[in-house]
From Swiss-Prot:
Residues 1-20 form the signal peptide. This is Putative C-type lectin domain family 20 member A. SMART domains: CLECT. Keywords: Disulfide bond, Lectin, Repeat, Signal. The gene is CLEC20A.
Amino acid sequence: MLPRALLLSFCAAALQLVSSKRDLVLVKEALSWYDAQQHCRLHYTDLADLQPSGLWKLYSLMTSTPAWIGLFFDASTSGLRWSSGSTFTALEWGQKLPEFGVGFCATLYTWLKLPSIGAASCTAQKPFLCYCDPDVGHLISTKPSLSLTTSPKPAVVQISGQTFMRFDQVMTWSSALLYCRSHHTDLADLQMVTDETGKEALRSIMSETEAWIGLYLNANSGSLSWSSDLGASIPSWLQVPMMVRGLCTALGIYMTYSPKVYSVNCSSLLPFFCFYDSSTGHRASAELPPLFHTSPTEMTEETTPRPGRAVASVGSGTDRRDTAAATEAQHLSSESKEKTSAQKSGHPFGILKADFTISTLMDPEEMKDQFLRQIQEVLKLTLGHEQFRLKWVSFEVNKK
């Protein structure tokens, strides 16, 4: 334990709201949850919890921007826990908690001037709230085992001397990139997957749930690039959708058809593919890819991309199938404005029509969830953070 005089000194330096010996501070630097916890334990005491005696001080520091607090999903107990060791109980203001799972931590923000708890991937970069207690001091030397995630057990295959692995833990594209670079080489670069043997090996670790790969639209050059910087060739079987800034690529498979590339909002939470190349090694210090027309340090996970187009298509030799050619976001937006608005239970709604080209062997009703996901990604680029819900009504066959 540090001398009390020293403890009082370090707390006084962080003091923003003084009323009792337990004080709170908002740190605006964006860090992952774990890095935020380490920062709080080094400079203060720990990430903030929601003790009733300190709620009024927390409230005065809160903003509409979500900030990390000490609450996280403990994978070892499959429940919520405070990083300080306190037992989690119901919230003072009676809010229904969002759904938490492995790899998710809690944020605190204001919504309509009321405090709200949010859930986000623990790897996301966010500001955070620390508390300072002079009777406890720094906790940097006290490192309890926090099971934010279960030990990753990826599906692994070897292709052309490279190791590919699929992780089911969900992250944003940027967070997955940083994870892959720190522990392996990078997000999956498929330039070496050129023959049927390689494709079949890759298929063995794929699923219908799309997972991030390293292909993205370089905002500086306007061309497709691999985040690994090992080249720019794209295998002929890898049919890439139309891309715009703010969209990244994910790989999935439907039934027995060829692997399909999806364009997805880069801030979405998806599983991901990493690869390891022994001749390259880790790339933890590599420069971040230019997803937007900003410097790498300005690229955040909260950036709202510009309107664009999302298209998904796949193919393999003569077995090519163009699927889910999603409509352009700007077209959808302008067309929806021409539709007659109506009110139902106080909520406005509009009717959108999207054209898709699929094989006659595929049932559109079975694929409606995939279609809706792609339309949703396009609308997110147009509507930003506005809340909306999509409902599948029907489909019709274009006989032209």
